[in-house]
Amino acid sequence: MHHVEKLCNILYVLLFGILLIVVMGSMFTWSFRMVWIPPIFVALFIIYITKKKRILKEEWCSVLWYIVYGACLVFLIAFSFLCEVAPSWDWGQVLESASEYVLKGTLDAKEYYARYTNNQLCLICMVTLFQWIRFALPDANFVDFQEISIVISCIFVWLSIGMIYLIAKKVWGKRRACIAGMLAAGCLPLYMYAQFLYTDTPGMLLLTIQLYLGICIYKSHRFYRKLW
């Protein structure tokens, strides 16, 4: 069992490094050497923290976490704009339809929403958001809508990472919560998906909130007994 766990850790580090190289490759195409530097440091940092977690004094864990958490939002937004892709698939369709409705008052893709009814609620929420933006910024256009939606999506992901830290803190304590939070803050798939204000980003926040509240209820034995 110990060998299996060690093998899984090695595979995790390798996959993490490969993914980080791909991401950094899109950001630092001007220098091949720069692509390899961040994965090495990040992998070494994760290995060091997980193997030497006892060096983390509990009184410093909160300070370290707040520093990492604050930097996480900056990196989320920076990654999202540096790795920005053209609007496509369902997210692009909802973004374009919401912008069209707010800017022109028309909706050409009615057949699409008749077929994919799950995107109707997402469209309503996006239209409402863009109407608020249009009210605050009368000259706002499609690019403004897209950029603001990216920032809001990053905030959703950032809050979800914060909830993961709170969940770990509730279950394991400050020290392990700090490690779990830093690992969540370094989870690159979250960075790659943060630019899409689609069902998954607010859904992840709602899921983590529900999980946190469920743990709070479970630990509150008095309320738990009343509930059942």
Walk through the language-model features, giving the residues of each.
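Short hydrophobic/aromatic helix or loop-helix immediately within or flanking a transmembrane segment
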Residues: 97, 112-144, 154-155
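Short helix- or helix-capping micro-motifs
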Residues: 180-188
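Membrane-interface transmembrane helices that cradle and orient dolichyl/undecaprenyl
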Residues: 210-227
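Helix-to-loop transition at the C-terminal end of transmembrane segments
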Residues: 27-28, 75-95
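Start-transfer (signal-anchor) and selected internal transmembrane alpha helices
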Residues: 1-79
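Hydrophobic core segments of transmembrane alpha-helices in multi-pass, intramembrane catalytic enzymes
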Residues: 38-43, 94-96, 122, 157-161, ...
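Transmembrane-helix motifs of polytopic, lipid-linked glycan transferases
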Residues: 151-171, 209
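Short acidic/glycine- and proline-prone juxtamembrane loop motifs at membrane-interface regions
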Residues: 189-203
